[in-house]
């Protein structure tokens, strides 16, 4: 079992700050609509079930959830979103994988490329950064749902690969082929997770202890976080405790 560290592989996600609430809601609505295109019955659509679970956790109003599902199943709706993955490299071998959901791939590609370029990085071809990561299922529970031992034992019994723990969340990593089954089994024991998705986990991390480089990296990930099309991103870096205390608290 891997102990989770706040300095390890910090993943910047759409924040809960007031100034980002509208953007977070828009992201949740898009994910629900995209998921619902595969069917509106959550019993047979685990991705939609996970999207609704995340929306409820983040207090997306019920009427907006229902409208997002209806929007996806409206035959007169011609709005199409595409899921795109970008891979980027910056200094010291740091790799970042960006997952976007967009209705304009040219716009999103240009914006993501500009962000990397501005802070000393470049987009690279498929596989040139992702080989540094494992692709797997990621299931995130609030830590209050169970003791770490209970969740660990249950998840490992079901075939999970690893678990990271901290005071706020328990994160379960699963093989993709077992992802849906493990969600369902754990949900029966602990309730549905805060969020669940197929994502990326670095095989090794690069320690950032230089202040100037850390500042540049933070600006880059903040710019990604501020982009409406970016859903998630994953990096193979970790900040030293000194950098974390000086710049991130």
From Swiss-Prot:
Gene3D superfamilies according to UniProt: 1.10.10.200, 3.30.70.980
Keywords on record: Cytoplasm, DNA-binding, Transcription, Transcription regulation
First-listed, main subcellular location of the protein, grouped into a coarse class: cytoplasm
Subcellular location: Cytoplasm
InterPro entries in the record: Integrase-like_N, TACO1_YebC-like_2nd/3rd_dom, TACO1_YebC_N, Transcrip_reg_TACO1-like, Transcrip_reg_TACO1-like_dom3, YebC-like
Gene Ontology annotations of biological process type: regulation of DNA-templated transcription
GO molecular function: DNA binding
Domain of life: Bacteria
GO cellular component: cytoplasm
Name this protein carries in UniProt: Probable transcriptional regulatory protein OTT_1378
Organism: Orientia tsutsugamushi (strain Ikeda) (Rickettsia tsutsugamushi)
